Amino acid sequence: MVVEGEITVAAPREAVFRSLSDAPFFASCIDGVRDLKQIDATRYDAMLETRIAYMRFTFRVTVEMSAVSPPETIEAKVEGTPVGMVGRLTASATTRLSETGHGTNIHYAINATLTGKLGSMGQPVLKAKAREMEKQFSERIAAAFAPGGARATA
């Protein structure tokens, strides 16, 4: 399943790159992420709690920043397992930043695969959840860089 989109924020590309490279900030933009722990310079463990259709899931996930090219590109790999059931989540994500006349355009592409019970839920259900999470993420990023936001620049 591929999820792709973009958002433009009123901030310089370098500031946006620094923020998106900051794991605690990035995790705060994703609904349900908790217990973020840094393993080493490029890897993090966390728990992700979410609801898909009528079921609630908790995943143990590891995120690895696989390629970072300041201030343009961040690539990450995610692997995880749902707690208490058989299955697996794997994903790769690429974020590209480009300057615009009014700030920075954030283009993201995520390719995710779910196996086990989750994988059997069907693409329409999973795609709807992915779009919901994408919308929340975009709103939180936009709010952080809006005037008065946590990452607003003067």
Q: Where does each model-flagged region fall?
A:
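Glycine-rich portal/gate segments that line the openings of hydrophobic small-molecule binding cavities
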Residues: 38-81, 136
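Hydrophobic/aromatic beta-strand elements that line small-molecule binding cavities or substrate pockets
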Residues: 5-7, 33-34, 60-67, 90-99
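Hydrophobic ligand-binding cavity/cleft-lining segments
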Residues: 1-51, 147, 152-154
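Short strand-connecting beta-turns/loops that link adjacent beta-strands
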Residues: 12, 41, 70, 100-103
